[in-house]
Amino acid sequence: HVLALIDAETTEELPDASDGKVMLVLDRTPFYGEGGGQVGDTGVIECAGRSIPVVDTKKNSGIYMHICELDGTPVSVGDTVTARIDAVRREAIRRNHSAAHLLQAALRTVLGDHVEQAGSYVDAERVRFDFKHYSAMTEEELARVEALVNEEILRGEEIVTVETDVETARKDGA
């Protein structure tokens, strides 16, 4: 169910003529909200037989805001909706998220346990992993890190998903 609509301000309904970006807050959602360097999910919210594109999802204080492109579809607080993520895109993001973990583990193996994540960006097409180290990596170190990551991928280990807070994740080596 739609809990809130946010256009230029919070409102109870958006009439037929509404076009442009709005935020929908639902009572529950399968969408991942942008956070920790990872982009938010996209997909559709189905309402009254029409599909409303979700172009991004943000999370703020535990509230998921679905950023939607309205094309005149009327939406009101209380409407029953079905939320569907773009599963192909989500899978690509999930794989890149896992690659970031593999990269960090390989960096720690090659460079030492002092390596810590200093930032990251994960989307469906790429991963950027920022880390702290006291010198530039050599060509040999880069090759060893790449080989370790590729070996882990080829092993095809089952992926275990754990949801935790940042502090616990850091203690566990993330």
Spans of model-derived segments:
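A glycine- and charged-residue-rich anion-binding loop/surface
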Residues: 1-174
